[in-house]
Amino acid sequence: MSGKDFLQKLLDGERVEWKALGEVAEYAGARIDPGQVNQENYVGVDNLLQNRAGKTHSSYVPTEGRLIEYRPGDVLIGNIRPYLKKIWLANQSGGTNGDVLVIRRTHPSLSPGYLYQALSDDKFFAYNMQHAKGAKMPRGDKAKILEYQIPIPCPDNPKKSLAIQSEIVRILDTFTELTAELTTELTARKKQYNYYRDRLLRFEDGEVEWKALGDVAEFRRGTAITHEQTTTGDIPVVANGPTPIYFHGESNRQGETIVIARSGAYAGYVSFWNQPIFLTDAFSIHPRADILKPKFVYHVLQNKQENIHAMKKGAGVPHVRVKEFELYDVPIPPLAEQARIVAILDKFDALTNSLTEGLPREIELRQKQYAYYRDLLFSFPKFPSSVGVPEGRSNAGDA
């Protein structure tokens, strides 16, 4: 069945009217005292999670001022940096501040779940960014947000409209629930992976020899390069983070390479590359082949990633120094044992991190299915209503 046929069957001959958000919803305006909230029901922009992942408990609860009240069924949206896609369908009552929009339905032909799905669409976040104000810390325009159009099936027949919306929400919830289950399982597997990694890389006193990295490996600094100096090519330019900053036509590292980000927020980040790369604001570690396998050293360092991040120095732009890594002690079991450990950890790593196999791949596929069906289920023919946003509605709930 084509997407068009599916929608026609779902609507069963009913019309769809596109309405401005301000015609069917409003900003909550009621205020509550700080004493009425706690870490569980206070929602600030910082404890709304990116990419539609809901919310987590707040580490901070205000003690003064008045808070915006939210209720079950309200949609809360982080209004700072809209591109982070912070959105949550409230299942409880609580309070928030002016950095979070509380959107409450007012139309009888609109369900909270349907409103949440409509505002979870990438098109909404793109619209919000398009009209956002501020360069460094963009903030959504509240008046423009209320002009955003959402489709309402047969708005003059609330019973039929809510039934159609319920079916749309049911279909989309099926994918989100499955993704949540897979994510929970992936979290459990990562904990299991970390446990086995700790066990495999834990050696008793006297079991193996330990040496400073500077005695058993060569350290090489990256080469400065600007984007303007790059030539056409597909070789990753690796610097101070987990992903390439751009691509180049030449490489300065070949084969298995351990990379340590030198400066910035990711200073000390350990990564492993087994392809030609161009290394810039970072340094690479090259162990002696007769006693250490590069991938084994990578796993040893990656297992201590938190400790390595703690080695950062500098108040402005944090950085790590080669000489500190040269003094870092690593175990040196026999090469055959290193190979065995690497094989086990690589398999675990693929199952928990690879986007080509295992749970990460399954989660990615479910997310793509969800996005496909969300786009399909909201791709109604666009016949906007002739009614504008009710006067004054856009100012409700201003902080």
Predicted features along the sequence, with ranges:
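Charged, alpha-helix-forming regions
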Residues: 1-399
